[in-house]
């Protein structure tokens, strides 16, 4: 690449300059933040709650631990972690998007979840935390929106304590042909219509469907985590692989 030439990446199916993607993604989430929780329930028929519950169950969170809920959005995981780590623990809800952080902060405070939760606007590619700081890091439905996923995984590895665990909950690739066909029909025909009706924004949900298709599949993401320094990496498919939970450890 010659000096001054821009590096390109994907924004959904579009090819864009890498340094423009973060702003484009920000526009999506500024647009949908206020109705984000409603859309999650509607578009997943509530199943996202079970995916997140399983993530919490396998996290091993205990009283006194420090947890980073990265791309934590409106705080579903943070709320659960806050209870598990207790008053001697700490949960950091970090998100690059200030609109999502505001919605999350308001929701959790309205539910009385205060004291052991802090809120940080942060880019996953360059996390503003000390080395070896967190016992657990989760990133749920956020990694596919990151411009440089490899840099983000390395950054997560840096701030994770030795013995700590990374959990990546993300849309992935259905395992059976019939499910793939049904999922494609739903994603590209039904989902944007839902977005248009509920949020007045079909384009953001077209991006959602496209970004899922451009995200690395299960085995590719597993290798990316290994390359970033994580060990004993494995994953569990849920709902036939529409979603996968990847786990990796730092030793």
Swiss-Prot record:
Extract one GO molecular function annotation from the record.
demethylmenaquinone methyltransferase activity
- What PANTHER family has UniProt attached to this entry? 2-METHOXY-6-POLYPRENYL-1,4-BENZOQUINOL METHYLASE, MITOCHONDRIAL, METHYLTRANSFERASE
Pathway(s) served = Quinol/quinone metabolism; menaquinone biosynthesis; menaquinol from 1,4-dihydroxy-2-naphthoate: step 2/2; Cofactor biosynthesis; ubiquinone biosynthesis
Question: Any idea of its EC number?
Answer: 2.1.1.163, 2.1.1.201
- Classification via NCBIfam families: MenG_MenH_UbiE (TIGR01934), PRK00216.1-1 (NF001240), PRK00216.1-3 (NF001242), PRK00216.1-5 (NF001244)
Positions of transmembrane segments:
none
| Catalytic reactions on record | a 2-demethylmenaquinol + S-adenosyl-L-methionine = a menaquinol + S-adenosyl-L-homocysteine + H(+); a 2-methoxy-6-(all-trans-polyprenyl)benzene-1,4-diol + S-adenosyl-L-methionine = a 5-methoxy-2-methyl-3-(all-trans-polyprenyl)benzene-1,4-diol + S-adenosyl-L-homocysteine + H(+)
- A single GO BP annotation from the record? aerobic respiration
UniProt keyword terms in alphabetical order: Menaquinone biosynthesis, Methyltransferase, S-adenosyl-L-methionine, Transferase, Ubiquinone biosynthesis
Question: What's the protein name?
Answer: Ubiquinone/menaquinone biosynthesis C-methyltransferase UbiE
Residue numbers binding S-adenosyl-L-methionine = 74, 95, 123-124
Any coiled-coil ranges, and where?
none
């Amino acid at each position: 690449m010659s000096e001054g030439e821009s590096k390109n990446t994907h924004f959904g199916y579009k090819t864009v300059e890498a340094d423009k993607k973060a702003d484009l993604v920000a526009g999506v989430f500024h647009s949908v933040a206020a109705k984000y929780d409603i859309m999650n329930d509607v578009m997943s028929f509530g199943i996202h709650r079970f995916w997140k519950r399983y993530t919490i169950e396998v996290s091993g969170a205990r009283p006194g631990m420090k947890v980073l809920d990265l791309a934590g959005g409106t705080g579903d995981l943070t709320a659960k972690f806050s209870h598990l780590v207790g008053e001697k623990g700490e949960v950091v809800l970090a998100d690059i998007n200030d609109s999502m952080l505001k919605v999350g902060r308001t929701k959790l405070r309205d539910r009385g979840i205060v004291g052991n939760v802090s809120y940080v606007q942060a880019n996953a590619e360059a996390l503003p935390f000390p080395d070896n700081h967190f016992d657990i890091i989760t990133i749920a439905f956020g990694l596919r929106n990151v411009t440089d996923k490899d840099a983000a995984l390395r950054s997560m590895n840096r701030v994770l304590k030795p013995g700590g665990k990374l959990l990546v909950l993300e849309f992935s690739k259905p395992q059976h042909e019939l499910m793939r066909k049904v999922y494609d029909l739903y994603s590209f025909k039904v989902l944007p219509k839902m977005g248009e009706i509920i949020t007045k924004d079909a384009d953001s949900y077209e991006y959602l469907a496209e970004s899922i298709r451009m995200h690395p599949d299960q085995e590719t993401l597993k290798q990316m985590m290994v390359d970033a320094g994580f060990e004993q990496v494995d994953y569990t498919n849920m709902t036939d692989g529409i979603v996968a939970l990847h786990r990796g450890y730092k030793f």
